[in-house]
Design a protein with these regions (language model features):
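A residue-level marker of the well-folded mature domains of exported/periplasmic proteins
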Residues: 1-142
Length: 142
């Protein structure tokens, strides 16, 4: 089905939940603590879709590998989770990642655009053996 009638324009839909599923599966396989976490910027479907995928990737890993990795920050059944309420504050990204780390998470996937850079800064300070970040929507290398 072609939605756009402009000949040199193509619309595209990316299944973010599928990419996040793979990230969750990978996180479940890499965690040393058995706890991973996620948080969002704003509670909207483009964000919660990522969080759903991450959660279900961890759950699939658990079912296939006999592990019991726990996901903090999101419940796909109730659609309840952790949200900063913005996509700008690096301080919030740092604080949310710190809280998840303090609860045992050694891998965190912020779904909050540039807010995740605050989480990445915390991971850089703690060291990658302590905390790993899965980046979304922003260049995490800066």
């Amino acid at each position: 089905m072609r939605v756009c009638t402009i000949p040199n324009v193509l619309g595209m839909v990316f299944a973010t939940n599928e990419a996040a599923f793979m990230a969750g599966y990978l996180a479940a396989g890499m965690t040393q603590t058995g706890v991973v976490g996620t948080f969002g910027g704003i509670h909207i479907p483009p964000v919660t879709g990522f969080m759903d995928g991450f959660y279900y990737g961890v759950a699939y890993h658990n079912s296939q590998k006999g592990t019991s990795v726990q996901v903090l920050g999101w419940n796909p059944e109730s659609k309840d989770g952790l949200f900063t309420g913005n996509f700008e504050s690096l301080d919030d990204g740092r604080a949310f990642a710190q809280n998840l780390y303090d609860e045992g998470a050694d891998i965190v996937m912020p779904v909050a655009g540039p807010v995740g850079l605050g989480s990445a800064a915390l991971a850089a300070e703690l060291g990658t053996e302590a905390l790993k970040i899965i980046g979304v929507d922003a260049d995490q290398t800066q």
